[in-house]
Amino acid sequence: MNNVQALPGAFPLHADKDFNTESEWVILKLLCRPLMEIDTTDAEELSRASGGQIRIERADELIRIVRISKLPGLGTWIARLMGEAGFDEAQVRTVKAEKIMARINERMGYPLCNDATVRALADLQIKWKGQREGSGT
C-alpha cells in the first residue's frame, strides 16, 4: 500500500482497491499465485495455467495493472484504470500525463481525472525520471 496523500481536488492516485474478479481470485489462489506477483509471468502462460479460464487479453491486463501499481505513488485503483485503458508500466512513466488521463476519462465516459490529477501524475513522472537517472537505468 502506498502511504501518499492526494493533492486537493485530485483523484487519489495512491488509493488501493480490488481490481480482480472473485473468480479470478479463486483461480489464482488454486494456482498458488499471489495476485501481486503475477507480473513476473506472461499473459499466455497465465491463461494456459488457468485452463483458459482467464483469457489471454485479461491476463495481460492483470499483469499490466500489477506492474503499474508497483510504481511509487500509485495504488491499484488508478493502476486498474490505466491498465484497462491500455497503458503499460513503461508508458505510464513516459506518456504525457494529460494523454493518460484523457484516455481514462474517455474510457470512463465522464471526467474522473481532472487538472489536479494530471498535475499529480506529472509530478510523479518527474520523480520517477529522477529516480531512474539517479540509478543509472
Question: What label would you give each PLM region?
Answer:
Residues 1-137:
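C-terminal extensions
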